[in-house]
Amino acid sequence: MKKILIGVIGVLIQLAVSGAVYGKVLNVYSPDGTVKVSIELKDKIYYSVFTGDDILLDRCTMGMTLSDGTLGVKPVLRKVRKGTVNESRKREIPLKNETVRNHYNYLRMNMAGDYTVEFRVFDDGVAYRFITDRKTPIEVVGEDFNINFPTDYRACLGEAHAFSTSYESVYTCMQTESYRKDDIMAYLPALLETPGGCKILISEADLTDYPCMFLKSTGNNGMYALFPKCPVRFEDDNDYKFKILEEASYIARTSGKRSFPWRFFVIAKNEKVLVENEMVYKLSAPCELADYSWVKPGKSSWEWWNPRIYDVDFRVGANTQTYKYYIDFAAELGLEYTLMDGAWMAAASDPWTPHPEIDLPEVIRYAKEHNVKILLWLSWLTVEKHFDQLFAKYAEWGVAGLKIDFMERSDQWMVNFYERVAKEAAKHKLVID
C-alpha cells in the first residue's frame, strides 16, 4: 500500500510539473534589449524572434529526429538556466577585426531525454543549438528547422539543384510568398529582407562531424531544412570525384555526448552591420593550435583565372617560363602567392609528377627568391588517395599550401574530410586555399 501511494504521488507530481510547463513561455533578450526570443513549450518547441515590437520570425519549430526518437516533441523541461557572457576574443588570424567582442544573454533548457537546448541572443542576432548527453553513439535522421515569416519577405538564395553542388551559383532574389514548395532548394547562407528593410542572414556555425544544412520552401511563406544523407558505398567516377552508390538512412552517425551545429540569424538594419558581423567566429569552438604565426593571408596570381599572356618573348603555356612570369607579376604587385592550377601536373591523379615542361623545384626556388609563395592545385580525390604522404612531402618540397578542388559535397563524410585536411595541413604548416 505504501509503495502504491508513493507511486501515485510520483505520478501526480510529474503531471503537476508537466502541466505547469506545457504552454510555458520563456523570454530572453539581447544585452541592449532590442532583440527578443520568445520560446513556448507545447507539443513542440516553438520560438519567435522580435526586434522591438516587430516580429521577424513567427512560431518557428525546432527538433532533432534520432533513430530511436525525436528531441523537441512533447518536451519536458527539467531545468532552466539564464546568464550573460561578455568577453573579448583575440582572433588568431585578424581579418575584419583583431579583437571580437562576444556579448550575449543565454537560455539553457535541460530536457527529459538527456538533451539540452541553448539559445544565445546578441545585439545583432540569435542562435540556438541542441546538446545531447548520451553514453553511446546516436544516428541523426533529420532536423526540424522550420521557420515562418509573418509577411512577404524578399529572399536572396544560392540555388542548389542537388546536394552535390559547387556553391558557385549566382544568388537569385524572390519574394518568399512566391517561393513554391516544388522550387529548388538553397544552400547557406540565405539572406532575407523585411518590408521595413531589416536584413536577416540565415546560416550555421561550429559544424563538425555533421552535414551542411540546405533550405527549401514550405509552400506557406516559410522554409524548412534538408540534409544530405551519409554515403556508405561509393566508387571512383573520374580523377576528380567518386560516385555515391548507396546512402544510409541517417544524415549523421556521431557521438551521443556532444553539441550540434548552431543555427543562427544575423539581424541587421543595413548592409554595413551585415558585413561587420562576426557571428560565425563568436559561435565556433576555440582554435586548437597554439601557434598560427606561420599562417599568412594574402592575394595570389592564378593562371586559370587569367590565362592569356601576350607580347612576351617565350612560348606561353604549361612550362617553367610561364610560371616565372606569373611570379614576376605577383612580386611586382606585392601579391603574396602564385597559384599553380591543374596544368602543373602530368596527370590529375598523380600528385608527385609535374608536367614534363615544368621544372617545379626551379619554380619554387625562383618564387622564394622573389618573396612569393607557391600554392599547388589538387583534386580532393587525389588528396584522399595519397593522404598519409602528401602533406609531409609537399612541405619538404617548399610549397606553401594547397588549393583542393571539386569536393562538391557537404555530407558528414565530406565535412569530416575538410577537418582532416585542415588538421593535417596545419601539422605541416601548409595553408589551404
Predicted regions and their residues:
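Bacterial Sec-dependent N-terminal signal peptides
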Residues: 1-25
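Short, flexible loop/turn elements at secondary-structure junctions
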Residues: 113, 123, 151, 268, ...
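An acidic-aromatic substrate-binding cleft motif
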Residues: 255-329, 333
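Aromatic- and carboxylate-enriched substrate-binding clefts and catalytic-loop regions
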Residues: 341-433
